[in-house]
Amino acid sequence: MRVRDSRPPFAGLANLSEEQLHRLPTPCYLLDEAQLRRNGEILLGVQQRTGCRILLAQKAFSNFNVYPVLAPYLAGTEASGLYESRLGREELPEKENHVFCAAYRADEFEELLQYADHIVFNSPSQLAKFGPAAKAAGKSIGLRINPECSTQEGHEIYDPCAPGSRLGTTRAQWDAAVAAHPELPALLDGLHFHTLCEQDADALAVTLAAVEEKFAGLLPRMKWLNFGGGHHITRPGYALDTLESCILSVRQKYGIQVYLEPGEAWALNAGYLVTTVLDTLRNGDTSLAILDMSAACHTPDVIEMPYRPPLLDAGEAGEKTHTVRLGGPTCLAGDIIGDYSFDAPLAEGDKLIFGDMAIYTTCKNNTFNGMPLPPIWLLGADGNCRELVHFGYQDFKMRLGAQ
């Protein structure tokens, strides 16, 4: 069953003219500079009012050509491993560089120390293995904790607090590790939890209470606490007052720095995927349209999560006169984007614009079936469009072998 997308639909692209839309190749990703800046202003305001530091989780959005747009607003980057950490260091050398990985590789760790300022470990065993080297290199060291507090509904695949989770250390696991290795606490500078996914601040408040209940004895000894990501801070209606109360409470109670590392919040509603109808057909009672984009290749979360992305000038199935199932051109039978309704029938050559396509798209797409990677364009704050990067046959071929 598809999860209904809770993100707000968009009513239009104010800065994009019909002429520019006509010139865009399809499929293509179109990043929106003005919306990136609007998101940045919101996140900067939270930092200014609370003293927290907000990082960009590059796993969600790593289009480094627009890092200069975000640079005035962010404190640094968060990485999931060596390559993202290097990207953050290369493109934002003056900003903080944080990294968390479920398990680090010994053959990569020395290089990682060149890029990261803060290194968060997932388990006491990883802390014991790599912590001394990180400490000797002058890094700030953290441990990801599992407060065993699930607040998610509808997409348990993203719940790090699910039973048997591999992510984070429970209090029982920590106590057992310290009993066997009393030197571990001296390595720690901070704690990190990441339990949310596209959620409001009420879920954070519940989670924070669980963190304090289970780990209160450790917090006064820490220098920082990282609230992780999954905070939909820039979504209309998000409870900023609740978020800021949570941050200020921790800072005042424990005298420590607070970090947040959202990914989606930086680029929420700041990108589009422009596509063209290749064919229309009917199977029984179902009207279908084949697009030149693929859910499986270009928007994997549509299938993985799953969710139904917003589409400009379209309604829910049955809401408007003509309901159509939109799908991609690959051989995967489930390469379906969703059912939408329109005021008029779709025709070959029609252009469609999906919204909120900056996040978890360009960083997750693939070339299954030999599908080309869409080029990435930028809609500038001045209303002009320009291509940031173009992909071709060699990008497909050279992922699969060498000449």
Predicted features by range, described:
Residues 246, 257-403:
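Charged (often Lys/Glu-rich) extended helix/loop segments that serve as interaction or gating elements
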Residues 49-224, 246-249:
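Active-site-proximal beta-alpha core segment in soluble small-molecule metabolic enzymes
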